[in-house]
Amino acid sequence: MRAERLRLSEEQGQRILRLYHLYRLTIGLVLVLLISSELEDQVLKLVHPELFHVGSWCYLVFNILVALFLPPSRQLLPIFILALTDVLMLCGLFYAGGGVPSGIGSLLVVAVAIANILLRGRIGLVIAAAASLGLLYLTFFLSLSSPDATNHYVQAGGLGTLCFAAALVIQALVRRQEQTETLAEERAETVANLEELNALILQRMRTGILVVDSRQAILLANQAALGLLRQDDVQGASLGRHSPMLMHCMKQWRLNPSLRPPTLKVVPDGPTVQPSFISLNREDDQHVLIFLEDISQIAQQAQQMKLAGLGRLTAGIAHEIRNPLGAISHAAQLLQESEELDAPDRRLTQIIQDQSKRMNLVIENVLQLSRRRQAEPQQLDLKEWLQRFVDEYPGRLRNDSQLHLQLGAGDIQTRMDPHQLNQVLSNLVQNGLRYSAQAHGRGQVWLSLARDPESDLPVLEVIDDGPGVPADKLNNLFEPFFTTESKGTGLGLYLSRELCESNQARIDYRNREEGGGCFRITFAHPRKLS
């Protein structure tokens, strides 16, 4: 019995035990008040008044001491001893009170029932057996001294039967309650596990998910949606506060649910998304489930297919142009070697050669664009990669040009094809050094790596102190064949943008207030699938 414990939970067991103490204290107090009042002779027909008085006081004092000094325990032995003592003391009061007419037998039935909530199986039935035997034996002893007690055997037997019935019924009810609670706990655990799994799946989804109530307050947002909204936490906030365009789109959908929502940008500088709405009817409140599908990857795949077809066409055209262009350049070179040419004619042949070289460079860039291989993104530690890039770059620096590196705090990683990143960065650095040298005679470029404070995405800025780009030409900066130099091909920045997009990165340009230009590359999240 020492090794056995209560099957109830600790909280339930302690609560029932406290109620048991309170019940016994109440009974003891009522008995003491009854024997101390004038109602004793009217209510009780005591056979042994002095024994009943002493027993009532002992019962009250015993229960007070138990309530004050018995430590809470889940061991069965202390509870068994307490219940058995309680039954024996009530049996003594039953005898002193004159047996069945005293009404103490009913208190025994209640005591047995409460004890069997805490004690289960044969241990609980021992308490019922003790009470039943006590009732029968004490009724027998009373019949020896009081002839009227001989008529109480049936009632005493009935009370004993009630003790066993109460024990068995209570144990069955408690057992069923335990099974119900166990099943409820198992189901609650299953539901909790499913909720955790659903939350994990929801957070790992690349599709942004928002749940909005009828007041347009955001109830739930997964990590992808937070990234699209450029926020850390939007729960409880108004949808219109963070994305007025999405709010307007949802209102239009409420008016006409069959309308296909147009693509939009959730935030001004964010990617283009395709929203879709599903109504979640919840009685009087109507919730809306919003899916935000980033279509930049779909557009990127379509762009790659378009470029693949265009690349094959341009490669054929470039190849056809290259042969006659080579003949023109060769003829101009032979003509320039003639001794009969005067100075103006030599100048013309030089122009032919210079423009032929420029045209050949355009053809080379077009062929390079058409032969561009599929991106193979890798997990990159940008700090380590940039440090290696800067260490290896001095061999390509001219005169006293300088390349500076500024690294932000913490671990900064992304997924990108390292060869294509090298190609993009080399092009941007060369442009920056060239324009910086034109403005100051010495080229300087700064590479600054950090995390965007809003999106937490890795950001690399290529900064120069050159003249910058005229405001009226900013919109055309990344278009093919757009150039601000007579010797440029206009394909470098276009190719850089295409390489960034094929790696799910974004490149932007802005003029700095203090002068110069800044190309900003926003990389993809390191856990984003390619």
Curated annotation (Swiss-Prot):
Changing R24E: Complete loss of PilA autoregulation. Changing N323A: Approximately threefold increase in basal pilA transcription. Its EC number is 2.7.13.3. The modification Phosphohistidine is found at H319. One of its GO terms (biological process) is regulation of cell projection assembly. GO terms for molecular function: ATP binding; phosphorelay sensor kinase activity. It is a multi-pass membrane protein. Residues 316-527 form the Histidine kinase domain. Residues 196-260 form the PAS domain. Residues 175-530 are cytoplasmic. One of its GO terms (cellular component) is plasma membrane. It catalyses: ATP + protein L-histidine = ADP + protein N-phospho-L-histidine. Member of the two-component regulatory system PilS/PilR that regulates the expression of multiple genes including the type IV pilus (T4P) major subunit PilA. Thereby, plays a major role in the regulation of multiple motility pathways. Functions as a membrane-associated protein kinase that phosphorylates PilR in response to environmental signals leading to activation of specific gene promoters including the pilin gene. This is Sensor protein kinase PilS. The lineage of its organism: Bacteria, Pseudomonadati, Pseudomonadota, Gammaproteobacteria, Pseudomonadales. The gene is pilS.
